[in-house]
Amino acid sequence: MRYDHSLWAHVCIGSVAMALFWGTFLSAKGSPLHRRIGRPFFLAMLATVLTVPPVVLLRPVPFDPGWIVSLVYLSACVGTVVTVAWTAIRWKDQPERFRGLHFRLLGPLVASLGAVVLVAGLVKGDPVAAVLSWVGLAYGTAMIYFARRRAPLHRQWWLAWHVNATLGLFTAVHGTLGFVVW
């Protein structure tokens, strides 16, 4: 695959994800339309994440390990947030399942990667990396805490996780676009 093809695939799938995001965002929450548009949005986000490796690895510039670290970190964060947003709704009546294996694996993963990105950002004097590290550090830590928490849950705990994750996806979609356009 050529770099330009991978880039166009990423742009096209990402554009579909952005359109689906806004369709979901503007629809009545919980309505059949919201669910009908929201499901393909999550799938489009996962597909967008899958198009990132070819874009990074086929770039016509010298190999840069920093880009690989960024790729792994951001892909793990987006994949985690998509999973949390989806499962919060699907498993809202099953809190133990929701905070089960995927929370116990993904929480420490994104928290650890966030720490790596923070250290790398501080060592390189890169404020963007240092700022982006908070996503993994904060979100991963919250996931670890929630997975271990055994106190009674708020009646709409699942909605808090869903909305929080969806706002994270808003940031991922629009932040990436802003970074590219800038």
Regions found by a protein language model. Give the residues of each.
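Alpha-helical membrane insertion/targeting regions
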Residues: 1-182
